[in-house]
Amino acid sequence: MALVSETGVDVSTDGITVVLGSQWGDEGKGKLVDILCDNVDICARCAGGNNAGHTIVANGQTYDFHILPSGLVNPKSVNLIGSGVVVYLPAFFHELENLVKKGLDCTNRIFISDRAQLVFDYHQRADALNEAELGGKSIGTTGKGIGPAYSTKATRSGIRVHHLYNWPEFESRYRKNVRDLQKRYGAFEYDVEGELVRYKELAAKLQPYVVDSIAFIHTGLKEKKRILVEGANALMLDLDFGTYPYVTSSNTTIGGVCTGLGVPPRAIANVIGVVKAYTTRVGAGPFPTEQLNEIGDHLQKVGREFGVTTGRKRRCGWLDLVVLKYSTLINGYDSLNLTKLDILDDFKEIKVAVAYIVDGKRIETFPADLDSLESAEIIYETFPGWQTKTTGITRWEDMPENAKKYIEFIEKFLGVPIKYIGVGPGRDEVLVKH
């Protein structure tokens, strides 16, 4: 085992490498993507919107990413926002301008699919009204309008990037969507005329960034470009396989890569799952291993568990291997990146969930019926902690024995090798375990 910075990490030229979140998000995908992007020609987003968020520290600068692919930090990579993404144009340009102010040259390095759906202010208004209607049973969305944007997509009333360049069609769709929302919510005041003027200006500003993403990505594959896909959110937030209805509105699994970029499954060469060494979640929804005690408080404080997008405190608990086994079955990980191992350094003992007892029966796969989890008993394996710093360790041989046992148990339980191990917040504090 050695530091990533010493060994280098290569990305295949024989197909797409995908980085996916394996839990409820915030696993640390951005840092791995940043490292991998040192050797990438194309970095792409395939789903979600600016509800995702992560921070990258490079070249003495801190960069916050929400809608843009983090491959922009590497001056050699070209970046693509795919067809499965929903894009709020003011946020797109705001984020881009912030990167340029910090010295990143983004010229001819960021492109957006002409098939991507657009998010508008009326989607954000609808998002807030939906949450208010749900009251105590609200989902805990980011309020960015992502769900309503995917809703209009599903009902075929959505507006795509290419509609900006067929203005009569754009205007007709825009006016109808606002009228429909006014019928739905009643008091829904909205400056349609002002927004249409704004979007005419944004259309002209956006035009140099718009591409046929299908031709773009398949040309890259044909030319043996090194392509990395940066997953947003995570498996347990997937619309179909997550903790429904406490999920996001897109497909955040490996299937979403194919549908969001327009590539066949055989084009994917390598799938890396990112796993936090414990578990966190933002917003409402089931969380079987949540620790509403000093353990959760310690993880939250030491792990600096605040959302990049919302600033909300993350809920914290022990690692859940039932969730991760389920995640592995669906996404088919070739390897894992275990992050934030150092946050566990001070614990005298560490627990890992290996099964649930539901209605008197032991289950080892995550159930669809979330109500059954409310009374579930969690079966844990308990490990002695290592109670020594892992930050600064550069070789597997120097890793505390109890930390090795923890890592090896996870590998054996899931049947997937842990290739990357994070032992600190810095870009160079990631070890490659061969």
Swiss-Prot record:
- Which source organism? Schizosaccharomyces japonicus (strain yFS275 / FY16936) (Fission yeast)
**A Pfam family assignment:** Adenylsucc_synt
Subunit (UniProt): Homodimer.
Q: What does this protein do?
A: Plays an important role in the de novo pathway and in the salvage pathway of purine nucleotide biosynthesis. Catalyzes the first committed step in the biosynthesis of AMP from IMP.
List residues binding Mg(2+). 26, 53
The entry's keywords: Cytoplasm, GTP-binding, Ligase, Magnesium, Metal-binding, Nucleotide-binding, Purine biosynthesis
GO CC terms, sorted: cytoplasm
The protein in question is named: Adenylosuccinate synthetase
Active-site residues, Swiss-Prot/TrEMBL:
26 (proton acceptor), 54 (proton donor)
Q: Where does GTP bind?
A: 25-31, 53-55, 314, 340-342, 422-424
> Record's family?
Belongs to the adenylosuccinate synthetase family.
PROSITE patterns in the record: ADENYLOSUCCIN_SYN_1, ADENYLOSUCCIN_SYN_2
